[in-house]
Amino acid sequence: MVQVISNLDEFNKLTNSGKIIIIDFWATWCGPCRVISPIFEKFSEKYGANNIVFAKVDVDTASDISEEAKIRAMPTFQVYKDGQKIDELVGANPTALESLVQKSLA
């Protein structure tokens, strides 16, 4: 299941939770975001039991989070562990996204 992060406080609590967090930064008007969204959801079901939290941030409704994360394009997927960004993928590439998830498990 994908968690929705709607404010900076939630973002900070989640990214500092000690778990691996993969966040999809997206926008409702972004075509590629809509295409990859069900794939991200599928990966959350496939890999979510492995101490990884999958989350989404709508960059338009949570602009403070997207500014904090320095988001410049959508979709952007960022991986966090212990409050630090450890990886990032820009673009709607399902193969690269699954590789990012698998690399995060290692």
UniProtKB/Swiss-Prot annotation:
GO molecular function annotation: protein-disulfide reductase activity
Alphabetized UniProt keyword annotations: Allergen, Disulfide bond, Electron transport, Redox-active center, Transport
UniProt xrefs under Pfam families: Thioredoxin
Domain Thioredoxin: 2-106
Family: Belongs to the thioredoxin family.
NCBIfam families in the cross-refs: thioredoxin
UniProt xrefs under PANTHER family: THIOREDOXIN-LIKE PROTEIN 1
Protein name, UniProt field: Thioredoxin
Organism: Coprinus comatus (Shaggy mane)
Taxonomic placement: Eukaryota, Fungi, Dikarya, Basidiomycota, Agaricomycotina
